[in-house]
């Protein structure tokens, strides 16, 4: 049986997938590449939106923006579905009662990413500690 696809967050995708040429071979980058080796990588719709927002906010030119769009096109984007919406609503509620940081409005984007992983059973690879102890979410390192 093949392993499920891995959902990566915006930071991991930007570091591992985006061919920016500025990333050194840091221990974190090498670790992430090792964890993703042989696995299908997917992103949440929220991640695609964050990537494009970052480019627009930084006033990227047409050529650089085209390069980003081409890189995004190499990674399947998981759309927001009824299951993701349900997972998001339940997750935010559980986080509120548990006092988890994903309950906060300023972490709504992270909650959408987590909900995508929960709804589809994808483990999440992230460098962001906010996802630790998220109800119903498996982090890739914990799944190994």
Regions found by a protein language model. Name each.
Residues 8-9, 44, 106-107, 128:
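Histidine- and aromatic-rich ligand-binding microenvironments
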Residues 15-17, 54, 88, 134, ...:
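Residues that scaffold the ATP/ADP-binding catalytic core of kinase and kinase-like folds
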Residues 58-62, 95, 141-144:
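Short, hinge-like loop/turn segments at secondary-structure boundaries
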Residues 13, 48-51, 85, 131-132:
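A generic structural signal for short hydrophobic patches within well-formed alpha-helices
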Residues 42, 78, 140:
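General small-molecule cofactor/ligand-binding pocket signal
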Residues 1-5, 114-144:
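Acidic, PIN/NYN-like endoribonuclease modules and their adjacent C-terminal/linker elements
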Residues 2, 75-123:
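Active-site neighborhoods of divalent-metal-dependent phosphate/nucleic-acid chemistry enzymes
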């Amino acid at each position: 049986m093949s392993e499920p696809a891995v959902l990566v967050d915006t930071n991991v995708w930007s570091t591992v997938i985006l061919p920016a040429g500025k990333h050194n071979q840091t221990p974190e980058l090498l670790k992430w590449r090792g964890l993703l080796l042989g696995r299908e990588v997917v992103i949440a719709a929220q991640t695609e939106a964050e990537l494009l927002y970052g480019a627009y906010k930084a006033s990227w030119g047409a050529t650089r923006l085209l390069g980003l769009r081409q890189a995004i096109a190499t990674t399947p984007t998981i759309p927001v579905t009824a299951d993701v919406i349900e997972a998001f609503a339940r997750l935010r509620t559980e986080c509120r009662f548990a006092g988890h940081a994903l309950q906060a409005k300023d972490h709504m984007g992270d909650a959408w990413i987590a909900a995508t992983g929960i709804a589809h059973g994808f483990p999440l690879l992230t460098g962001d500690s906010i996802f630790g102890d998220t109800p119903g979410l498996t982090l890739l390192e914990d799944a190994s």
